[in-house]
Amino acid sequence: MPVVVDKDTNAAALGLAVGGEEGAAGRSFAYLHLGTGLGAGLVIDGSVHRGARTGAGEFGHQVIQLDGPLCECGNRGCVEVLCLGAVGRGEVAEAARVLGVAAGNLVGLLDIDVVLLGGRTVSGAPEAYVSGVGEVLGALARREGAGGDAVPVRVAPRGERIVAEGAAQLLLAPLFGRGDA
């Protein structure tokens, strides 16, 4: 019996890439998962990007506030500690803004087509997260002269099921000739 190990966010991204996120096939997107932690699954030109040492997607530990609060990883001002801190205080708008700033870094670095949001925390207030992240990306697009064409932000379809669907694809895709699982 084959065994495959991968990050939940990579599994979700794979599920979205091959499982029918409308317009995702062959495109580049970030799946941002906000739950008890914060991670990302990255799809570049239709394939999950894991990095040379499988470390791609450690989204929650990018530093965005140099003198910020201490994170459990040992850094200060990580997106995860700032975002989850706001969630813990009931400040959903602030959590969405912080998530948007970090998403803007991804958009600027990778020039992705769409940002998809998921996870239990996002499920609790999906409109607030889509709106908050979208506002930050819209401001970024205006500053960069993109003519107001911000990268779209949506809630990933199929909720928590997408992780399980992607995990199944990790095993099944190679059996059906899809080598980029």
Task: Please name every model-derived segment.
Residues 1-74, 78-83, 175-181:
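Phosphate-binding/catalytic loop of phosphoryl-transfer enzymes
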Residues 20-25, 67-181:
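ATP-binding/phosphotransfer module of carbohydrate and carboxylate kinases, centering on a glycine-rich
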